[in-house]
């Protein structure tokens, strides 16, 4: 029986999960919910089902895999990572995965808060000012490794790809000073399962955010 991934019909928090499901050749189907237009941003498609799915903490995204019903995007990725043994093999690798997972989510939320803020244009220069320092830390952490944990890909590379590429869309030149990060993105997109998925109609790189966002809603 295929897994079910539920989320809005946007990139959002599901991008890394979708990429991981494709990379692992998982059997899954998507339940994509559509939000209404301004000014009401009707969410009834989701709200009508929210408390009927048996989720402990009803939210989007969710993954249903048989009796396992999971919310929180990173919990979903960790579950899938364990299922496919892609969480790091040594203690050092697992520590690197844990650190980067949380660091990436911090940075993801900073960008999301900016893009949903009504004062986006006023706040954008401040974000761009600190972006090179943020990217430098990722570049130093990756070093000469092919993947962030080491020689083998882990679930955190899927989050890293999402966050780095999202920032690259936001500011096209933000990775120009960090060739190892650009190489990482090219390496990730060059994975056969990923490149094949990117050519399908299921691939959803945009919109980045919901219709309520000031930037990235189309």
From Swiss-Prot:
Report the Pfam families cross-referenced here: GST_C (PF00043), GST_N (PF02798)
Q: What is its main location?
A: cytoplasm
What is the E.C. number?
Answer: 2.5.1.18
Q: Where does substrate bind?
A: 116
Q: Where in the cell is it found?
A: Cytoplasm
- The organism is Mus musculus (Mouse)
Q: Which UniProt keywords apply?
A: Cytoplasm, Transferase
GST C-terminal domain span:
90-208
**Catalyzed reactions:** RX + glutathione = an S-substituted glutathione + a halide anion + H(+)
Family the UniProt entry places it in: Belongs to the GST superfamily. Mu family.
The answer to whether UniProt assigns keyword DNA repair to this entry is: no
Residue ranges of the GST N-terminal domain?
1-88
Quick one: which residues bind glutathione? 7-8, 46-50, 59-60, 72-73
Q: Which GO terms describe its cellular component?
A: cytosol; sarcoplasmic reticulum
Disulfide connectivity?
none
Query: Know the name of this protein?
Result: Glutathione S-transferase Mu 7
What is its biological role?
Conjugation of reduced glutathione to a wide number of exogenous and endogenous hydrophobic electrophiles.
Describe its assembly.
Homodimer.
